[in-house]
Amino acid sequence: MYRRGKKDCLAECKGSKLFCKFAPSRPKRQKESRMRVGFGYDVHALAEDLRLVIGGVEVPSQRGCVAHSDGDVAIHALCDALLGAAALGDIGKLFPDTDAAYKGIDSTILLDRVCKRLGEEGYRIENVDITIALQRPKLRPHIDLMRARLAEVMGIEVGRVSVKATTTERLGFEGREEGVSAYAVALVENI
């Protein structure tokens, strides 16, 4: 089979400045983007007589998260999103649940350490978005406090922090009130 070459194409185009799909081209080298996106997810079972801490805020509840740390699903998902954006691993790698040093630890301490690590690697947090799936208790009364607490720990304006809560319409383990999950997206810039 005959392949059309540059000479054939140029002869057809006769000097036209229009793009010719047959003309060979060299791939342009793309600059590495300074903006990076990360995604995080976390889930914990719920049990009686444990504290429920979400987004750095203790939420009044008869049930709380079963976890090695304080079980803050929102912060754990956020840490994974931030670490993922910078390709720095995940929360389990940095703070393994096999290490007694992290037993019962306040997750805002973990988030602070993640933010410091990002800074050391030359990243700045642009914005974060978190969705928490929990049937009960309702989180709406606590959202603004969560946003403020997370912004404080990360050292960014509260307007760069979005926290949303949803039920799962009684579907899945969240709907059956067996557990809570959180999803997070983070945008960071390499400065």
Predicted regions and their residues:
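Short acidic capping loops at alpha-helix termini that bridge into adjacent secondary structure
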Residues: 157-160
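C-terminal edge-of-domain segments
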Residues: 174-191
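RNase III-family endoribonuclease catalytic core
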Residues: 34-145, 154
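Active-site phosphate/pyrophosphate- and oxyanion-stabilizing loops and adjacent acidic/basic residues
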Residues: 148
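Short, Lys/Arg-enriched N-terminal segments with co-localized hydrophobic residues
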Residues: 21-34
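Pyridoxal 5′-phosphate
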Residues: 163-167
